[in-house]
């Protein structure tokens, strides 16, 4: 059974591309035709390509990797925030900071600063500062939350990116390619698909289309996490079972050397009696 159906894609308007005079010729293989000067995307390909990307997300997360959700255009901001938050993944839905991937060491310092500000405001230790300085710290905190709030819990680089409109998010695409981080993207008829590892041909402007893909990938993340936890539990159980078997095969291994056996105590007592005689 397909993870996403043709009916869902049609209802979300995924098949509508851009006007025929605003296209990228490299998207020709994914175009079904044109109607009223609007390109129509071949949804048969979308279904198959989406399935590949969906499985990739599950596999990546099941190995402990994170998927960064990215979509800064107005139509995508809510879906990116809601779905990434639902599945516990990092996201960027406001502005992409240059170097967010390629200069993560510096970005991490800003995240640490945000965590510090959160802490002093939450435990009220900020009251030790002058009132004017508190206002400045509050403004700094709000600014950092806006651009870094979605990646505040990110400890290292993501294993892959999910991008809405790679044409808009060119900096993110370039940074990911430089670091060889795989990219999944909703690619409209005006986009260049060359730098995208997992192409999802579709409308990247319709809110319903963005919501559909974002929610499906969030589901894939959730499934990947379930498999990851299941694998960890299986490894823990295996280690425990192995330890139990070893103890059963060699029960004396657990007896501390400092504890004397009854036989050794008895032998020592007999020796003392012989000496006294």
From Swiss-Prot:
Domain of life: Bacteria
Phylogenetic classification of the source organism: Bacteria, Pseudomonadati, Thermodesulfobacteriota, Syntrophia, Syntrophales
Gene this protein is translated from: rpsB
GO biological process, one term: translation
Bias (Basic and acidic residues) ranges: 228-241
Protein name: Small ribosomal subunit protein uS2
Keywords: Ribonucleoprotein, Ribosomal protein
Annotated region described as Disordered, given as residue ranges: 228-277
InterPro entries linked: Ribosomal_uS2, Ribosomal_uS2_bac/mit/plastid, Ribosomal_uS2_CS, Ribosomal_uS2_flav_dom_sf
UniProt cross-references to SUPFAM superfamilies, sorted A to Z: Ribosomal protein S2
Family as reported in the entry's similarity comment: Belongs to the universal ribosomal protein uS2 family.
UniProt GO cellular component terms: cytosolic small ribosomal subunit
GO molecular function per UniProt: structural constituent of ribosome
